Amino acid sequence: MAQTPLRIGIAGPVGSGKTALLEALCKALRQKYQLAVVTNDIYTQEDAQFLVRAEALTPDRILGVETGGCPHTAIREDASLNLAAIADLEARFMPLDMVFLESGGDNLAATFSPELVDLTLYVIDVAAGDKIPRKGGPGITKSDLLVINKIDLAPMVGADLGIMDRDAKKMRGEKPFVFTNLKTATGLSTVVDFVEHYLPTKVLAS
């Protein structure tokens, strides 16, 4: 019986803090679990290289996928590139506990294919304005955890965190969300706890 790793997708608009969250999660979890990462960029491996430079994990545990087109397709309609990258990492490091998949920068409509990930974390940032949660879209309404990042910028951009809290509750119903400032690790422990909560539920696959 071989353990199948928990696959966690991280999506969100360009500049929202996806890679920063991924770095923080890797550093918080790497002493307890066997981790690997797959990043998606259209023509480069910039995010993968950033994580290597940040020493989030050893370089051989971080694979960059160059989608060569719309990054949404590689995480939704045709996930073959990402599935191949996961298979490569599993072959090298099995048993893995978690594999993180970071999408390319996207809009509010991007979603991961259910065959690709078990959980989705969707990252938005306060600097985009307090109207973002009520704009909706699958990332806002259907992600397993909504991460509202860069709360330290709220006073500078005139964003009201109270409004964002109200609208996130309205749009998500019972689904959880968290306010974060990844520079100071504010809210990070909530994200870590959320991810860890799902580990025991992964079934063993033959």
Swiss-Prot record:
One of its GO terms (biological process) is urea catabolic process. One of its GO terms (cellular component) is cytoplasm. Gene3D superfamilies: P-loop containing nucleotide triphosphate hydrolases. GTP binds at G12, P13, V14, G15, S16, G17, K18, T19. One of its GO terms (molecular function) is nickel cation binding. Pfam families: cobW. It is found in: Cytoplasm. Keywords: Chaperone, Cytoplasm, GTP-binding, Nickel insertion, Nucleotide-binding. CDD domains: UreG. It comes from the Bacteria. Facilitates the functional incorporation of the urease nickel metallocenter. This process requires GTP hydrolysis, probably effectuated by UreG. Homodimer. UreD, UreF and UreG form a complex that acts as a GTP-hydrolysis-dependent molecular chaperone, activating the urease apoprotein by helping to assemble the nickel containing metallocenter of UreC. The UreE protein probably delivers the nickel. Belongs to the SIMIBI class G3E GTPase family. UreG subfamily. PANTHER family: UREASE ACCESSORY PROTEIN G. This is Urease accessory protein UreG. It comes from Synechocystis sp. (strain ATCC 27184 / PCC 6803 / Kazusa). The gene is ureG.
